[in-house]
Amino acid sequence: MKWTISCLQFDISYGKPSENIKKAEFFIEKESKHADVLVLPELWTTGYDLANLDELADEDGRSAQSWLKKTAKKHGVHIVAGSVAVRKNSDVYNTMYIADKEGQIIKEYRKAHLFQLMDEHLYLSAGSEDGYFELDGVKSSGLICYDIRFPEWIRKHTTKGANVLFISAEWPLPRLDHWKSLLIARAIENQCFVAACNCTGSNPDNEFAGHSLIIDPWGRVLAEGGREEGIVRAEIDLQESAEVRESIPVFDDIRKDLY
């Protein structure tokens, strides 16, 4: 089985959900004819306007889910819908939704690791469940930005069988080298595909790196964006993950008696 995955890399308008939704719809309209799965960046409706999240957050995720269901069904495409700020009671979570091409929400994942350097912990609550899901029978996982710095968290998903890691981010330009190195390492050590969608542009506090990446289980970069807005697309052969795991049986050699 093969998938074409497209990362929709764009400049997120700071604190302006209506503008960002229009931009996402433009890219989805443009790319849905060419891909099986579309991936959006982190906090793509609001950007990191953390100080105003109390006002901007989507109550129970109702607006985001309604939009996502209609959009995925209209275009007949699976969407890993980046993440949005969702209010649940008194908490706000950095939340990823995944919709299948029939317009059904099949997974909700809340970012588990909050990045204190950008004050996330002051405005957001951390999730406590993993991002594992199956899409068209393909074992997959969704993760958000800072999560990729925690290999133990990634391994939890791949030991459940995930062959594709979908990652949404707002990764800053000064740490672009970390972004690339971490993603390639996660692909190699877990023998899986990685599709990582970053944003570009800037906000009042940060300049973002772009360079969305699609990586195969050997750690080879299949597609990479630049600093500008655009589509990062690659076709992947999903059988390759199983073949790599068979050729170098890392998972069979894990020393559970030691770690």
UniProtKB/Swiss-Prot annotation:
UniProt keyword Lipid metabolism present: no
Gene3D superfamilies in alphabetical order: Carbon-nitrogen hydrolase
EC assignment: 3.5.1.111
InterPro entries for this protein: C-N_Hydrolase, C-N_Hydrolase_sf
Disruption phenotype: Impaired growth on methylthioribose (MTR) as sole sulfur source.
Active site residues per record: E42 (proton acceptor), K111 (proton donor), C145 (nucleophile)
Residue ranges of domain CN hydrolase in the record: 3-238
Protein family membership: Belongs to the carbon-nitrogen hydrolase superfamily. NIT1/NIT2 family.
Name of the protein described by the UniProt record: 2-oxoglutaramate amidase
